């Protein structure tokens, strides 16, 4: 893990990557491509120290409400999120400024923020997308060695009623 300060975080397509890099180790991951100009090992997570402040500035300046997307390049619920809480801080800002949220993850850690995701959905809209590559636990550990197990994901689905 290494830390950095960023000048911007919200893309022109309204996407954010709270972290840069990922520890899931998925063998098929496109985000490892050199075209994304990452100058460090993909597993060496870049923590954007000022992510929430920069996001707040960007949300304050937006003229129209929209859906903010996260998780496309780096899972917002990597192991470090438990300690750092940057994803929760950013989601709180998205909620307080009245934006919708579309979030992709492979982690059952998203359950920690279920209260906030429900609030966003009640106010605007929240879409949660969880990847299910295979139900075969042994195969999963080969192709996605550090993601939540399928049984953990299935348990999270059973524990959480639909947002709408």
Predicted stretch roles:
Residues 152-164:
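Single conserved hydrophobic/aromatic residue that forms the stacking wall/gate
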Residues 146-152:
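Glycine-rich S-adenosyl-L-methionine
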Residues 1-129, 135-138:
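Conserved Radical SAM active-site core
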Residues 139-143:
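Short acidic, glycine/proline-rich loop/turn micro-motifs
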């Amino acid at each position: 893990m290494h830390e950095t300060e960023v000048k911007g975080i919200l893309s022109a397509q309204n996407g954010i990557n709270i972290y840069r890099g990922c520890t899931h180790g998925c063998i098929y991951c496109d985000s490892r491509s050199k075209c994304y100009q990452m100058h460090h090992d993909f597993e060496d997570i870049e923590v954007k120290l000022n992510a929430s402040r920069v996001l707040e500035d960007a949300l304050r300046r937006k003229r129209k409400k929209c859906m903010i997307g996260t998780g496309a390049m780096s899972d917002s619920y990597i192991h470090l999120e438990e300690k750092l809480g940057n994803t929760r801080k950013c989601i709180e800002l998205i909620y307080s400024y009245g934006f919708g949220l579309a979030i992709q993850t492979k982690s059952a850690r998203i359950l920690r923020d279920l209260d906030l995701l429900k609030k966003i959905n009640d106010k605007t809209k929240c879409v949660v997308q969880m990847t299910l590559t295979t139900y075969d636990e042994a195969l999963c550990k080969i192709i996605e060695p550090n993601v939540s197990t399928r049984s953990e994901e299935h348990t999270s689905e059973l524990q959480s009623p639909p947002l709408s």
